[in-house]
């Protein structure tokens, strides 16, 4: 790092994400959603379905279980979730991603694509899809990816693996529960 920083006249970073640290992450997330009168749509890593700590979330009607074991989310996954969300009678105002980096990236991309017409692969790149979509909230279950604060959603598209990169892709809220990230789940 010293070599990199020695060539920079300044170094600044900004994180637009509100970070909430709680040992009761799931409860804190649900309480906050209720308190703010949000209509959430949950994107949850399917590996979490058998863990009792997530039972209150899995009872939600607006839920998409994502199999994150394969690889990064695909642009087709984003299009599927957007279609599900738009076909319902509810207007969802927040997409909640719960899981590892791939699941959070899927939720982030869905949040952007809800407000921008066309397929998700059209927004892979920098500064595309600049209409702000639904709020994006995340609850990571794996530490180290950084997806909970970054303005990038990495997707595997029909022709390339590339991120959706714009200021609205960063989650507005991240609930960090150290108990959920203490081991790979």
Label each residue range with its predicted role:
Residues 63, 110, 170:
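N-terminal loops that bind phosphate or other acidic moieties
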């Amino acid at each position: 790092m010293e070599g990199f920083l020695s060539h920079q006249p300044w170094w600044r970073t900004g994180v637009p994400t509100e970070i909430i640290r709680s040992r009761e992450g799931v409860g804190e997330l649900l309480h906050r959603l209720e308190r703010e009168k949000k209509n959430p749509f949950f994107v949850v890593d399917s590996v979490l379905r058998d863990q009792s700590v997530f039972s209150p979330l899995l009872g939600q009607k607006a839920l998409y279980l994502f199999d994150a074991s394969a690889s990064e989310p695909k642009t087709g996954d984003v299009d599927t979730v957007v279609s599900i969300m738009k076909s319902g009678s509810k207007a969802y105002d927040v997409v909640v991603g719960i899981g590892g980096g791939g699941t959070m990236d899927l939720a982030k991309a869905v949040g952007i694509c809800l407000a921008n017409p066309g397929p998700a692969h059209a927004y892979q790149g920098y500064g595309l899809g600049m209409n702000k979509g639904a709020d994006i909230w995340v609850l990571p279950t794996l530490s180290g990816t950084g997806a909970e604060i970054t303005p990038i959603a990495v997707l595997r598209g029909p022709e390339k693996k590339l991120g959706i990169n714009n200021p609205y892709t960063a989650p507005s809220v991240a609930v960090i529960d150290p108990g959920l990230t203490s081991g790979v789940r």
